[in-house]
């Protein structure tokens, strides 16, 4: 069984993290470990109709963002990696500078030092040079920078179609197969 850490930061786009958890709930080969920042809790309430309790119930294990002694805070705890979806600039900055002031950034720091996959779905626009430098630095230390940028070749009809495409592409980064793809993959012209 793969253990995947799912981080949700306070950036806009909490629905991406929720949808990822919804999809993985039905994948028996994956155990999810959720950690949400305090700002993520606010964003969740502002942007969705999901309660904190409902989102936490989607995860196999939920960790308090203040618990720096949690299992996922140690490299000796085996995981398949971590995704932060969405990833705020504050969280990105904390990761790049090894400023592990809570479990979200501590778990990401552990993933990097253990050379496991870390996918950062940075959600900000427009970007200034400081943001771009942070993303470059994160990539240099081993993270995958994967902004949730929609694709249109699969002809999305709804917002769910756009969200599903991003979530499916994130799962591709961890080699997590789904019973069926959430979008139509490009087959060539």
From Swiss-Prot:
It is an enzyme of class 2 (transferase). FMN binds at residues 10-12, 37, 88-91, 123. GO terms for molecular function: carboxy-lyase activity; flavin prenyltransferase activity. Keywords: Flavoprotein, FMN, Prenyltransferase, Transferase. Pathway: Cofactor biosynthesis; ubiquinone biosynthesis. One of its GO terms (biological process) is ubiquinone biosynthetic process. It holds the Pfam family Flavoprotein. SUPFAM superfamilies: Homo-oligomeric flavin-containing Cys decarboxylases, HFCD. Dimethylallyl phosphate binds at residues 153, 169. The keyword Acetylation does not apply. NCBIfam families: PRK06029.1, ubiX_pad. Belongs to the UbiX/PAD1 family. HAMAP family: ubiX_pad. This is Flavin prenyltransferase UbiX. It comes from Salmonella typhimurium (strain LT2 / SGSC1412 / ATCC 700720). The gene is ubiX.
